[in-house]
Amino acid sequence: MNRKFIITMLALCLVFVSHAQEHKIEHNFNLGVGVASLAKNDVHYSFRIGYGLNYYLAENWSVMPGVSYRAVFEDPFKGDVVGVESDDCSFIDVPVLLQYHQHARGEKGFVAELGPVFSFLTSNSTYYTDANPQDELNDKKMYKNFDFGIQPGVYYQTGKHWRFGVQAHIGFCNMLKKYPSINDSKRLNDVAATVNFSF
């Protein structure tokens, strides 16, 4: 009984060791700044910072779950406009990305990624009508708590650790909360220039 148990455990250890040698895990940190299609007549900016754990399925393919903080905000140098509310917001994103690596590990080449992203609202904006302080929308939250979308990206890897490219967020959900006087819809999208450090 003990011999069978030991042999079974040794066999499992050998499988895990060989599996670990065939597949590589890679840590990724990314930082991005870009623009977002949040306002009708005004450009908004986006900022993101995140971490991903990249698991290589094969030489050119990997899957990378991760977590990141993403903020969408107005031009910080514009100043407040009387009678116009701020519509800034931020999210914790949880993407699960499939990546294709054109090159061998640690070499120069392109990387393309695509996958679903689950977004959880961390800061909201509220409505405010300066011309009518009694408006029923005043102080009510604008956005829903959850969004679902996809996250495409393309990068150029310069060597063993650094990748530079473009990453986007495409939201599928109408993020505006339902109120009797609100008939609009708003999907949150952004594109960001991104730098990625991996090891």
Task: Locate predicted features.
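Bacterial Sec-dependent N-terminal signal peptides
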Residues: 1-30, 195-199
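Transmembrane beta-barrel outer-membrane domains
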Residues: 22-24, 40-46, 85-93, 141-147, ...
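Gram-negative (and chloroplast) outer-membrane scaffold detector with strong preference
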Residues: 23-27, 33, 54-130, 189-199
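Surface-exposed cleft-lining segments at the edges of enzyme active sites
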Residues: 36-37, 137-139
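Outer-membrane beta-barrel translocator domains and adjoining extracellular loop/strand segments
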Residues: 39-45, 75-82, 124-132, 176-182
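Short catalytic helix/loop segments, enriched in acidic residues and glycine
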Residues: 46-54
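Predominantly the C-terminal beta-signal and adjacent terminal strand-loop region
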Residues: 64-77, 89, 141, 150-199
